[in-house]
Amino acid sequence: HVDSGKSTTTGHLIYKCGGIDKRTIEKFEKEAQEMGKGSFKYAWVLDKLKAERERGITIDIALWKFETAKYYVTIIDAPGHRDFIKNMITGTSQADCAVLIVAAGTGEFEAGISKNGQTREHALLAFTLGVKQLIVGVNKMDSTEPPYSESRFEEIKKEVSSYIKKIGYNPAAVAFVPISGWHGDNMLEASTKMPWFKGWNVERKEGKAEGKCLIEALDAILPPARPTDKALRLPLQDVYKIGGIGTVPVGRVETGILKPGTIVVFAPANITTEVKSVEMHHEALQEAVPGDNVGFNVKNVSVKELRRGYVAGDSKNNPPKGAADFTAQVIVLNHPGQISNGYTPVLDCHTAHIACKFAEIKEKVDRRTGKSTEDNPKSIKSGDAAIVNLVPSKPLCVESFQEFPPLGRFAVR
């Protein structure tokens, strides 16, 4: 995979606008010098954070955030992290916007966008998973021929526009920004090296926006409507027993509202109980809304009866239920060999982790249009999309993607 400079770009933003304290930076800079990394580079920041995270040192999550004039931005993909795709699909991390970084260097862009390049795969995946806002950073403008070449930028913009359009994005609503994550051109302020660049501009039904640099493009993201009007769905991440309080399930409200007094049902176990109190960051809440990570105390239910992967809902309003089987659209990303009826992988859906059998592969479909291309195929392979009937080894709480997206997405491992 060609390195498009995601880490450097991300590192630069975190470094300049973000949550890394002075002490940590000085420590990193010193280490970089000792290791002969000479000039301290932004990707190094990210490498350090990733290494610490992979060793199981929980890093202060503030490190993965930075601020713009308008938003707190949380970086979900520490690029190259092996669980990225799984995390993206299971919605442990649902993004509001994707930033696609393509390398402008000679040959680099072509490799990334080639038939099996990762640029394509990531853009398609983002769209398929419902990340409908996109920004394109045309990176490494310092290494074009000649450096900071307008014609190279325009060539890439044209090519990327045409293929994101095929995927389903509207290029007119996508900001294309020529940048150098290494030197900082057009990252936080307009570059003097590209006088030809008059700025990016986007048009969408919610209005127009324009600007010069990447950080302004992030500021122009439209905040998504949080689904408070839908029925409550809260997948459990953990369940604790807390002395003097009792049983406390913990998870993120995906849709609807949770408040004290709600009579909740836990699916698929079908256990019903009253919510006594709701807490976030050690403070009592009168109501929790989508996006809130909360703990809530429930009456007369023991820790043993609940588990990660169960889903809490309101017993009186469209409650969740377990499914003995379900039909889903499956896209095969990277799987060696053929998959046929009877294949039983482990499925990750919201917080549930459970073996599921491909009971019947009903049809192959076109990944972009969803139109059927073959009925009852013998098998499917990497790159294929299919409609499959799945049977979980024990009941699983899934929902239609249309109604409850976070509970209608899954990854198969």
From Swiss-Prot:
One of its GO terms (molecular function) is GTPase activity. Keywords: Cytoplasm, Elongation factor, GTP-binding, Nucleotide-binding, Phosphoprotein, Protein biosynthesis. Coiled coil: none annotated. It is found in: Cytoplasm. Residues 1-228 form the tr-type G domain. GTP binds at residues 1-7, 77-81, 139-142. The modification 5-glutamyl glycerylphosphorylethanolamine is found at E287, E360. The keyword Cell membrane does not apply. The keyword Cytoplasm applies. GO terms for cellular component: cytoplasm. This protein promotes the GTP-dependent binding of aminoacyl-tRNA to the A-site of ribosomes during protein biosynthesis. Belongs to the TRAFAC class translation factor GTPase superfamily. Classic translation factor GTPase family. EF-Tu/EF-1A subfamily. This is Elongation factor 1-alpha. It comes from Heliothis virescens.
